[in-house]
A protein has these predicted regions:
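SAM-dependent transferase fold signal centered on methyltransferase-like domains
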Residues: 1-157
Length: 157
């Protein structure tokens, strides 16, 4: 039995429920995911984010967008394990939670296409320079070292 709509809306991380939800979502179904562990995703506890979401967050003015992009990547990795593609339709952060709605398509080729958009976000605290990179390091043209976030979803939100 597959479902057209599954909503994961619990307290803290959605991780314990992602595998089951992705396995049971129908082709073309909508998967809604809420994360209330914003302290991890927004960079207050970066080691917790690394353990839960396999990515490093940023703690600056971009923290909510970076957190959403990390959450999207985590869902896409779980979906790819099931040969499904989780395409973000709508995402937002409000107060103490982040929420993303996905359209789920079947097919390993579609999943592989999404996985190519998992990269690193590099941020320079010196000049506020930003760039997306497949590599997780390097220095900014102003001479400062980049602060690294990710890997994360770099596609459209």
């Amino acid at each position: 039995m597959c479902f057209d709509y599954i909503d994961i809306d619990q307290f803290v991380t959605p991780n314990p429920f992602l595998d089951s939800a992705v396995a049971k979502i129908a082709r073309g179904g909508i998967l809604a995911v809420t994360a209330t562990d914003t302290s991890a995703l927004s960079g207050t506890y970066p080691r917790a984010c690394l353990r839960k979401y396999w990515a490093m967050p940023l703690r600056n003015e971009l923290k909510h967008e970076i957190g959403i992009r990390i959450l999207i990547r985590k869902v896409q990795l779980i979906a790819a394990h099931h040969r499904k593609a989780a395409i973000p339709l709508l995402s937002y952060a409000d107060q103490h939670y982040m929420r993303v709605f996905f359209s789920v398509a079947k097919g390993k080729e579609k999943a592989d296409t999404l996985l190519k958009q998992h990269q690193y976000f590099l941020y320079c605290d010196g000049c506020m320079g930003r760039k997306i990179s497949e590599e997780n390091g390097g220095g900014c043209s102003c001479g400062e070292k980049y602060t690294i976030a990710g890997p994360l979803w770099t596609g459209m939100l």
